Design a protein with these regions (language model features):
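Short His-Asn-centered micro-motif
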Residues: 26-28, 76, 110, 140-142
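Catalytic PLP-binding core of fold-type I/II PLP enzymes
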Residues: 85-123
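Short acidic, glycine/serine/threonine-rich loops at helix termini
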Residues: 36-40, 84-87, 118-123, 149-152
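C-terminal, well-structured subdomains that either form a transmembrane helix-short loop-helix hairpin
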Residues: 71, 75, 80, 84, ...
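PLP-dependent aspartate aminotransferase-fold enzymes
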Residues: 1-75, 89-93
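Active-site C-terminal subdomain of aminotransferase-like
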Residues: 121-124, 128-171
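Active-site-proximal loop/turn and secondary-structure-junction residues that shape catalytic pockets
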Residues: 30, 79-81, 112-116, 144
Length: 171
């Protein structure tokens, strides 16, 4: 998605875009599996230290970290240290402004590995899911709640077009 957008925006061929290194903005509270993505896909991790008082990243920090090479922002719903939720709605609002101002298409992935089966049942939470315009995908882990083998997890995309043709497989 990003490479096609970047090529079109900068009048480049697909081959010319291959040398560009995209980045993902996220909290330093990320799960270790993200390291594999960064290494295997040659993506620069733009890591934000969470606030020492809330242990969440702030929308202003995200705004300062994104640029035209940003392929996404990861918001964590239930970090591994204290279970805190990043302020997805606030980050979505900041990205709305940035995307409109700069003609970017930065989306949000909600890493709800730890909070994905808790947050939907909390009535007092601000929107954090597909109700927000920039949330493109949400992941959750089944193995954290028992009843499944280690490593069981799911990811759901809002729209088929946001899932890379290299990832989707029809059987």
């Amino acid at each position: 998605r990003w490479r096609k957008w970047f090529a079109k925006k900068n009048n480049l061929s697909d081959e010319e875009v291959l040398g560009k290194r995209p980045n993902i903005v996220m909290s330093t509270c990320y799960q270790a599996a993200w390291e594999k993505l960064f290494k295997y896909m040659d993506i620069e991790p733009r890591l934000i230290s969470p606030s020492s008082s809330s242990f969440k990243i702030e929308a202003e920090q995200v705004a300062a970290a994104v640029d035209e090479y940003t392929i996404g922002v990861v918001c964590i719903m239930g970090n591994h240290y204290g279970g805190q939720y990043d302020p997805v709605a606030e980050i979505d609002a900041v990205l709305n402004d940035i995307n409109e101002k700069h003609n970017f298409q930065i989306g949000i992935h909600v890493d709800a590995a730890s909070g994905g089966f808790i947050a939907p049942f909390q009535d007092d939470l601000p929107a954090w899911d597909f109700r927000l315009a920039n949330v493109l995908s949400i992941s959750a882990s089944g193995h954290k709640y028992g009843g499944s083998v280690c490593g069981t997890g799911w990811v759901v995309w809002r729209k088929r077009k946001d899932l890379s043709e290299h990832v989707a497989i029809s059987v």
